[in-house]
Swiss-Prot record:
InterPro entries, A to Z: dsRBD_dom (IPR014720), RNase_III (IPR011907), RNase_III_dom (IPR000999), RNase_III_sf (IPR036389)
Name of the featured protein: Ribonuclease 3
Catalyzed reactions per annotation: Endonucleolytic cleavage to 5'-phosphomonoester
GO molecular function: double-stranded RNA binding; identical protein binding; metal ion binding; ribonuclease III activity
């Protein structure tokens, strides 16, 4: 329970129903019945709304062509992981199999905010203000800097073209999970080098696989 209290202190919110917080932090490998997946489904919508609302309010350019790449970054696993670091969220996740990766941290981050929303009596305004209290400055900084998601597939292709004058290949390995929460696993390969990436879409999984292959190629130099 002390661990939960530490997280509550970082959040600035004390849960009335501690089991909600525990559920938000629990991976399906730890508990088949009480895990975060349904909360993550709700939290995805909540967090996306909070962030996109700020983006539309504070962006210096309101054109869709400018907003879309910013939005893609701001609601990405990469950015959610940066925000989650402020809470040291990885320390509180309960998991039995596998390692805690960016996908799991991103999912738990979303589930956590759904748990706050439900525990507060489904008070969206309260939840949004708490979220902004913690993360508004980080979001506004990203908007001001015009941060966009890195295109790892393009970066990888530039590396392989330069080294071998060849393009990497991508292969869909599997699609897992229910319809509302599919997980795509993709293999990226060039010569004898192969890596896997996973994501909520094939495109995202390809980007993750490309990122891992870049790391592998850098290590092999």
């Amino acid at each position: 329970m002390k661990m939960l209290e530490q997280l509550e202190k970082k959040l600035g919110y004390t849960f009335k129903d501690k089991s909600l917080l525990e559920k938000a932090l629990t991976h399906v490998s730890y508990s088949k019945k009480e895990h975060y997946e349904t909360l993550e489904f709700l939290g995805d919508a909540l967090v996306n709304f909070f962030i996109v609302d700020l983006l539309v309010q504070y962006s210096p350019n309101k054109r869709e062509g400018f907003l879309s790449p910013l939005k893609a970054y701001l609601i990405s696993e990469e950015f959610f992981n940066l925000l989650a670091q402020k809470l040291e969220l990885h320390k509180f996740i309960r998991i039995k199999r596998g390692k805690i990766n960016e996908t799991i941290i991103g999912d738990v981050f979303e589930a956590l905010w759904a748990a706050v929303y439900i525990d507060s009596g489904r008070d969206a305004n309260f939840t949004r203000e708490l979220f902004y209290k913690l993360f508004k400055e980080d979001i506004l900084s990203a908007i001001k800097e015009g941060r966009v998601k890195k295109d790892y597939k393009t970066i990888l292709q530039e590396i392989t073209q330069k080294r071998w004058k060849e393009r990497p290949e991508y292969r869909l390995i599997s699609v897992e999970g229910p319809h509302h929460k599919k997980k795509f696993i993709v293999e990226a390969k060039i010569k004898e080098y192969r890596t896997l990436g996973e994501g909520k879409s094939k495109k995202e999984a390809e980007q993750r696989a490309a990122e891992e292959l870049i790391k592998l190629l850098e290590e092999s130099e």
